[in-house]
Amino acid sequence: MFKVGIGYDVHRFVEGRKLILGGVEIPFEKGLLGHSDADVLVHAIIDAILGAMGENDIGRLFPDSSPNYKDISSLVLLKEVAKLLEEKNMKIVNIDSTVVSQRPKISPYTNEMKNKIADCLKIESTQVNIKGKTTEGLGFEGREEGISAYAVVLICE
């Protein structure tokens, strides 16, 4: 049986933090605010996987009220979700995702992001797709207040 899940996340920019997207540190003057490393792309992918599995969302599985997850790499959380998939004998068919930001442009980093995400999930990088989009200056992303990400995941049992 095939199952699909959709994920979404958003974080706002702040001074004094690193910008991490898809597990990759991207040179930029601001980072994203969050309890963990605030990796919106990985968070959206985690939520999509959990949704396809019929599980709770990322906030319930890894609550921001827990000190265990303070500043944690989202790739560590993704590996935990990969273990859940394995326990349920489910496999990822593919992931399609979109990062929405006016700046920075992510295209120079997408191959590295794909590889890191695929490694965590024990799948091929060809099963992971990452696109970058702007909002042509519209909305909070267009005003460079933050970044959002969307992900769709297809899994099979």
Curated annotation (Swiss-Prot):
Keywords: Isoprene biosynthesis, Lyase, Metal-binding. Its EC number is 4.6.1.12. 4-CDP-2-C-methyl-D-erythritol 2-phosphate binds at residues 9-11, 35-36, 57-59, 140, 143. It catalyses: 4-CDP-2-C-methyl-D-erythritol 2-phosphate = 2-C-methyl-D-erythritol 2,4-cyclic diphosphate + CMP. Binds 1 divalent metal cation per subunit. Pfam families: YgbB. Pathway: Isoprenoid biosynthesis; isopentenyl diphosphate biosynthesis via DXP pathway; isopentenyl diphosphate from 1-deoxy-D-xylulose 5-phosphate: step 4/6. Involved in the biosynthesis of isopentenyl diphosphate (IPP) and dimethylallyl diphosphate (DMAPP), two major building blocks of isoprenoid compounds. Catalyzes the conversion of 4-diphosphocytidyl-2-C-methyl-D-erythritol 2-phosphate (CDP-ME2P) to 2-C-methyl-D-erythritol 2,4-cyclodiphosphate (ME-CPP) with a corresponding release of cytidine 5-monophosphate (CMP). Homotrimer. Belongs to the IspF family. This is 2-C-methyl-D-erythritol 2,4-cyclodiphosphate synthase. It comes from Caldicellulosiruptor bescii (strain ATCC BAA-1888 / DSM 6725 / KCTC 15123 / Z-1320).
